[in-house]
Amino acid sequence: MNAQETKQYLLQKETIDPQAQPIIHYANSSAKLAPTAAYPQGFPSGLLGNQASSKEVASVVSFEALGRTWKSSEYLYMLARWSTNDPANVAIQEDILSASSGYVIKRYKQPKHKRFTRPDFLDWRHEWMLWVVWQKCLSSAGFRNLLLATGDATIVEVVRLDPVWAAWPDENGCYVGANGMGKILMLCREALRTNSAPAIDTDKLNAAGIYILGERVQF
């Protein structure tokens, strides 16, 4: 799958039948599924999500990228909304980083600064999210192990009003939506298994000119 095919895959709406395939799902950072041999207290599927932060399990959700430690992938992902080379955006990014959790970022910080979001952000948000999650995979052994422990299951983020990143069960119990986060996790899982890397359109990301805390990110 090349970068263009990867983008098409991430955008494509799907209907996922849990009766036809094994499913690993999560709706929030505290979600747990049935116990397994490796996870006798219940498989912590919620730790797969972006909003799971270091207050849950730091060894799984925190990671290194761009020369610093991130409490969760939600922090780094969100900074790109305000990532032009503008001192005002550095102030916004620092405000985002002051949030106590990924939930606080999404619920309170994002709406506060929404009007300053880069107008081109939606053009490359999937590529950026894939890059962020892949950095997490490369940096965090705990997260890698958790992701690989999902086996061959289809991973689904379950959110009612987010058909881009998640999916929601219909009247037949099938999950409907693009499930972008679930797909990104599965792409990274496959890359880890095959000792490769997901197909990320780094040319698009470089062309966007993404600045994090005043430094341009080179891909």
Region locations from a protein language model:
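Charged, low-complexity intrinsically disordered segments
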Residues: 1-219
